């Protein structure tokens, strides 16, 4: 909403050194024009093409969601490249970093914490060891700690396709 009211391009960097799941989810939710991720070899040519397409469609206010571990560089390098290619665009940079972990929990956050806490205690009573309780596909599961530490959430390419459609 702020981008629309001020006719600006916002580059928003979120956590995601190794995986772009947060950036992809946030990009989808916000209707971001582009989502720049560590898993994808995003290029400046693609980014600039998205911006040119937005200009051609008279879309003057946009958001570009950036995961911190992307291949284009840090958010300030990306902003500099955009400013060089599009000097008339007012580019603003926001780095959320660990700020995004803060804030008051939502109802869903509280329910999830209660359910996972219940299952953690249930697991202890049942003799589960070296596991954590978590949700996968709306089901509570026990995941080995080793897996929780070493595995990453895989991006759903369909999510990126939907995000691209909604951005136009």
Residue ranges and their predicted role:
Residues 1, 23, 113-121:
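Hydrophobic alpha-helical segments within soluble ligand-binding/sensing domains
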Residues 3-90:
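Accessory alpha-helical/coil subdomains and C-terminal extensions
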Residues 55, 120-128:
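Short, hydrophobic alpha-helical segments
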Residues 66, 92-93, 131-135:
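Conserved active-site loop/cleft motifs that coordinate metal ions or position small ligands
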Residues 75-78, 104-111, 143-151:
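Short glycine/threonine-rich loop-to-helix capping motif typified by GTGT followed
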Residues 99-114, 124-125:
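Catalytic, metal-anchored helix/loop core of enzyme active sites in primary metabolism
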Residues 131-168:
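Phosphate-binding loop/pocket of nucleotide- and phosphate-handling active sites
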